[in-house]
Amino acid sequence: MPGKPNRHRTKKFQWHKFHLFDQKLKNWDKIFYIDINMRIHFDIEPILKLNPENKLFARADSYPDYDRDLSSQFFKESKYYEKLNKNYNLSIKDYFQTGLMFYDTEIIKSDTKDNLIKLSEEFPLSCTNEQGIMNLHFGFVENNYQELDINVGEYKTY
């Protein structure tokens, strides 16, 4: 992995978020996911009252300046980069970060988890584990990502 050859030694959990799109999670109507290192400072009820009907709500990774694009999630030196760039618009600046996601489980199809894994195998050049791959899938293949509004109720989501 260019630039991060020992990442596997320091980052114990990688790619685990694909399990959030396993068929078993369809036992619930909606899923609210938050990374363990995030802190909740205010009531999250206004977010939970939103209706992500057939959507995945998340904050844009490059907010507030939108100065990075999706290509920043992948190693450009990889032999797979040209194909990736040809197949997907890597210049988008509102790609999402996977630290906080709220979604309708209707977006989970029988093959969603497998398709995420296949994408990661087809394009093994992600420098942020699942985040770039999930953007390809939910932002382009399924087109059901929607940026979570900055203001929800009286609170800011970022």
Language model segments and positions:
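Glycosyltransferase catalytic domains, chiefly GT-A lineage
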Residues: M1-Y158
